[in-house]
């Protein structure tokens, strides 16, 4: 960055840096105690960037995604990991491909239905946050961190029920042992991003988020069937 005269950077961080939160909604100042390698690696980079910002007078914004979800509204860009580990695409795939059996990891968490609760934020809302962060750093210098989510939590079972409403089919699943390193609940307090960046989510309804993901997966399946 220094060699190329670049002074602003936006880093894609994660809610996983907080570990098991002590409050229902997580503010930026919450203690960072990651419990899995992913969260630890992201926190390590945040700390490195803070050191670089001080040493080289760089401007750094860390955007802490909660659960990124959904697809572009025109269904051209969507979520396709291999192997897939994210809940929403796995639920959808289980209805499209019989071989992709849905597994629910843990049903004895201390939540209202025993399954993990997460805060889902649409990918295009996250993209807008990046643009707003870059614009903000044109006027302000330093190190900034923002939690990005809808500030509303949905359990694994809530997501399955939402998918059933969207896809209009009953979804079968098996209960598997809980995965080590999965906090029971992660919900963002995104008030700082709203106040400073002027950021608001356009996709606040979980059914609308899932609908964009389903339309993308459906389109991909149709394309594959044609080939």
What kind of region is each of these model predictions?
Residues 1-8, 136-140:
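A short helix-coil junction within the Rossmann-fold of NAD(P)-dependent oxidoreductases
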Residues 9-13, 61-64, 119, 147-149:
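Structural signature of the Rossmann-like NAD(P)-dependent dehydrogenase/reductase core
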Residues 90-227:
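C-terminal substrate-binding subdomain of Rossmann-fold SDR/epimerase-dehydratase oxidoreductases
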């Amino acid at each position: 960055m220094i060699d190329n005269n670049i002074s602003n950077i936006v880093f894609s961080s994660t809610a996983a840096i907080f570990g098991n939160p002590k409050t229902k909604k997580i503010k930026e100042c919450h203690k960072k105690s990651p419990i899995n390698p992913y969260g630890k690696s992201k926190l390590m980079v945040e700390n490195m960037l803070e050191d670089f910002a001080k040493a080289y007078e760089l401007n750094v914004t860390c955007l802490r995604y909660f659960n990124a979800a959904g697809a572009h509204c025109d269904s051209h860009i969507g979520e396709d990991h291999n192997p897939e580990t994210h809940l929403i695409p796995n639920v959808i795939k289980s209805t499209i491909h019989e071989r992709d059996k849905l597994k629910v990891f843990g049903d004895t968490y201390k939540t209202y239905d025993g399954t993990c609760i997460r805060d889902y934020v649409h990918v295009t809302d996250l993209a807008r946050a990046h643009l707003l962060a870059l614009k903000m750093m044109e006027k302000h210098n330093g190190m900034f961190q923002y939690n990005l989510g809808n500030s509303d939590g949905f359990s694994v079972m809530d997501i399955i029920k939402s998918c059933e409403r969207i896809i209009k089919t009953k979804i079968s699943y098996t209960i598997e042992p809980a995965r080590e390193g999965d906090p029971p609940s992660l919900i963002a307090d995104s008030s700082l991003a709203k106040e400073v960046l002027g950021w608001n989510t356009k996709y606040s309804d979980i059914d609308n988020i899932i609908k964009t993901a389903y339309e993308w997966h459906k389109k991909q399946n149709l394309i594959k069937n044609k080939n």
